[in-house]
Amino acid sequence: MLKRVFKLFQIARKLSTSGAIDTINQVHQIPISINLFFSLISIGSKNTSLRNNNPGQNLCEALQGMGTTFIKLGQFLATRPDIIGEEMAKDLEKLQDKVPAFELYEAKKVIKKEIGEIQYQNIIEIGEPIAAASIAQVHFAKIKNENQEKQVAIKILRPDIEQLFNEELDALMLFAYIVENTISKAKRLKLVEVVHLLREITNIEMDLRFEAAAANELYENTKLDKGFNVPKI
């Protein structure tokens, strides 16, 4: 419980110093008690660089800078204009799921841990990342397959991303529960529902087996179509 509370304070400070709370306040008037909490926790460190844009652009920039959990939160809220309004939802659709790639040596450590030392010996070469998003990144690689070399693409989850995501969502759920049960006006924001659905959606996204199964199904459905090529997983 103490760990969740500490993480909650870290997140609250991020939200406030990034300008996200000020932006939300322009669209949904946040209860005075919550505003006071965020004001106190961010004394002397507020980001003022976002004030020239409209609220939706401000929120996009703030969430983009806060990492995976908040990028996903923004993308989810873009599908819920009933909660944040049509205009802000449209602005959040522009939120880019792009973050800096993690280092190649970290990618190699993750692969070795997942497939084991013996299977790892079949990898001849792993290239630098060619695409990076908040949850995973992709590398081209060369592997040994039945005494032949084969070019493949490997998608790798970010190191410790599942633990980080679930820790931050646990803290957000605690915050949502406290707010909904102590401030009657906040119930209309459906904070607990938002956090719960975000957890479900992103946990599915982090299980790459679902993506692999969908890709294999697409391959089977299109393998006889001329001019259409889906890589096998």
Q: What positions do the PLM features span?
A:
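Glycine-rich ATP phosphate-binding loop
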Residues: 140, 150-157
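Conserved ATP phosphate-binding architecture of protein kinases
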Residues: 136-145
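Core mixed alpha/beta domains of very large multi-subunit molecular machines
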Residues: 115, 214-215, 229-232
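N-terminal accessory/targeting segments that precede structured cores
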Residues: 1-137, 163-191, 195, 199-202
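Hydrophobic alpha-helical positions that pack around
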Residues: 211
